[in-house]
From Swiss-Prot:
Name of the protein this chain belongs to: Probable GTP-binding protein EngB
Tagged with keyword Ubl conjugation: no
Purpose of the protein: Necessary for normal cell division and for the maintenance of normal septation.
CDD domains from the UniProt entry: YihA_EngB
Family per similarity comment: Belongs to the TRAFAC class TrmE-Era-EngA-EngB-Septin-like GTPase superfamily. EngB GTPase family.
PROSITE patterns: G_ENGB
Key words of the record: Cell cycle, Cell division, GTP-binding, Magnesium, Metal-binding, Nucleotide-binding, Septation
All copies of domain EngB-type G, residue ranges: 29-213
InterPro entries on file: G_ENGB_dom, GTP-bd, GTP-bd_ribosome_bio_YsxC, P-loop_NTPase
Binding site for GTP: 37-44, 64-68, 91-94, 158-161, 192-194
Gene: engB
Length: 217
């Protein structure tokens, strides 16, 4: 099977680097997708569930634990010459954690915003929204930035196992309506549960299509 036809989630993923500042970014090459969201929205848990590896992305009960851009790629590529992974998933620092020192928050914020504005290989940002709380002001601020920077993004609801199943369709419709007029928003809203596995295949397929890969498995 040609390298470009390898299923995206059919083999292990690895962590390749943490990026505390833009100087540490890997060279631009394969297309990237990034995961953004409020602190404790479940980014690390969702990444682990997507790739089927519980310990890949570190999870913590401490909000604001992720302080760098963390890069994950499919394993089995040397990274040299043309032997590059087909894509990278970037776990971005959580936003909206009020108890973090202001200097630290400002540093995280600048790193994330500079990355969003300047990364040519960034294909889409998946903005994670806790299904129990919906879109908050901090989320709206990030969506405003993405619209201004013309960076494509898609809303992904997390922790749907924490709300009544009957309420999920209504929440999907309400969320879609809230972002309907936003210029950079991808119109489809996804719902997921890392705990139950709900919606993971749909998200895997969405990522594969975004980076130009026909199959995710």
């Amino acid at each position: 099977m040609p390298e470009t036809e390898k299923p995206l989630f059919g083999h292990p993923w690895i962590f390749i680097r943490g990026v505390p500042s833009l100087n540490f970014l890997p060279p631009e090459g394969p297309l990237e997708v990034a995961f953004a969201g409020r602190s404790n929205v479940g980014k690390s848990s969702l990444i682990n569930a997507l790739v089927g590896q519980k310990g890949l992305a570190r999870t913590s009960n401490t909000p604001g634990r992720t302080q760098e851009l963390n890069y994950f790629v499919p394993d089995g590529y040397s990274g040299e010459g043309g032997d590059l992974p087909p894509t990278a998933i970037v776990d971005m620092p959580g936003y909206g954690y009020a108890q973090a020192p202001k200097e630290q928050v400002d540093k995280w914020t600048k790193l994330v915003f500079d990355y969003l504005r300047g990364r040519a290989t960034l294909k889409r940002v998946y903005v994670l929204i806790d299904s129990r709380h919906g879109i908050k002001k901090n989320d709206d601020d990030v969506l405003d930035l993405l619209d201004k920077a013309a960076v494509s993004y898609q809303i992904v609801l997390t922790k749907t196992d924490k709300i009544k199943a009957a309420g999920v369709p209504k929440l999907l419709a309400e969320t879609a309506e809230k972002i309907r007029k936003r210029p950079a928003a991808y119109p489809g809203v996804l719902s997921t549960s890392s705990e139950k596995g709900d919606g993971l295949d749909e998200l895997r397929q969405a990522i594969a299509e975004t980076v130009g890969i026909a199959r995710w498995k």
